[in-house]
Amino acid sequence: DKDMWYDPQKDEPYYIDADGQKIYDVSNMLHIDQGGHFVLLATGTDGIHVHDTYFAKHNTRNARDIYDFMACNDVTVTNIYSRVSSDDIVKPGSDCSLGFTRPARNYMVRNIVGDTNCNLFQIGSETADDIQDLYVDNIYVLGANKAGFSISTNDGGHIKNVYLNSGKTGAIHSRSVMHRTRAPFFISISNRGRVLGANVAPFTFTENGNVRKELLVTNSDIGQVENIVICGVDIDEVYGGSSFRGERWKAYDGSQSTATPIIAGFKLPDIHFWKLYERRGY
C-alpha cells in the first residue's frame, strides 16, 4: 500500500511510509531484466493490475516496451521503476489485431519512474478506437529522448479525459518531475488510418515550402483530442538526455536533440495548466 518514489542522490527508488519516512528496502519488488520487445503486451483484456516492479536492475540491455495495453479496460499500474528502456514504459492504445476495434477506458496509473529512449507515458500511437478516462498521478522522468507525457492519435480515435496529477488515484505525495526530456509533453493528431476497411489514395502537396507525396486514408475521420488536464509538474533540462546510449547521465553539450515547445503539436489555448514550471538546463 506504500507509494514508491525516487532518490536522485542514490539513483534508486524508495517507499514512503505512513510518517513520510523513506524506506530503501525495495526487496519486495519484482525484478525483470532484459524484458525483450514487450514485458507485457495485453490485447482486449479487462481488469489488469500490475504493480511494484523494478526493471533493468542488473542488466539494462534488451529492454524495449515495458507495459503495452491494447484495447484494454479497467487497468491499474502502480509503483513502477525502470532504470532504462528503449521504448515506452506505460502505453495504452487500441489497434485492429483482434480483427475488430475495441475502445479503451478507465486507467489508473500512479508512481511511474524511469529513463527511456522514447516516452515514459504514451497514449497511442495505435488509436483505431477511442481511448478515454485516464488518470495519471506522480510521474518522475529521469530522461526521455522523446516525451515524458505523450498523446498521439493517428487512426481516427477520440482521446478524451486525460488527467495528470488530479489526485484521482490517491493523494499527490510529490510534484511530478521531468528531467532531460526532449519534449516534456507531446500531443499530435495525424491520419495514418490504420483501421479495418481503410481506402487510400496518393496525394501531392506542399508543406512548409517542400513538395511531399503521401499515401493518405480517404474514408477515416481524423482523430480528436479533448479535455487534457495537466498540473503540478517541475521541468528542467529540456533536451533528449536519456542514458539509453550509455552514460548516466551525459550533461547537455549541444550534441543531444532538443525541442523548443513544452507542448508540441497542439494548439495551446485548448489545454489547461496549473502550476507547471520550466527551468531550462542550457
Specify the residue positions occupied by each region the protein language model found.
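Extracellular/periplasmic carbohydrate-active domains that bind, remodel
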Residues: D1-Y282
